[in-house]
């Protein structure tokens, strides 16, 4: 755990890092895999908390969050802070991690099927 002025932030452990590494090895961008892994464990977090816990830079977190938002994998909620200024955004996964893994699995199966179809076409042309 990392303790900040606001609260404590869970950091990724070895199992979490392995999980993110496997997602990355399957073709997911590293920073996206890390943010998904973190949110699956933390439930919800601000970009600042994600950065502290994952050691990703703020720009890396922003790009990963944008990519996940574009894929409809995360939601964002505005949370007003006690002081002045704009509200903070808190992110969470829209689906349980098992559903995200299933979606990723289906995508890989579809890609494999397309590759096998191309190979069969090649064989037919020989």
Identify the residue ranges that each predicted region occupies.
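N-terminal leader segment of winged-helix/HTH proteins
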Residues: 1-26, 82
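Short, cationic-aromatic polyanion-contact patches
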Residues: 21-31, 46, 79-101
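Pre-recognition alpha-helix immediately N-terminal to the DNA-recognition helix
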Residues: 33-37
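A short acidic, leucine-rich amphipathic alpha-helix
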Residues: 49-53, 68
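Key DNA-contact positions within bacterial/archaeal DNA-binding proteins
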Residues: 59-60
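Glycine-centered, phosphate/nucleic-acid-interacting loop/turn motifs that mediate DNA/RNA or nucleotide
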Residues: 72-73
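Amphipathic alpha-helical dimerization/coiled-coil segments
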Residues: 95-126
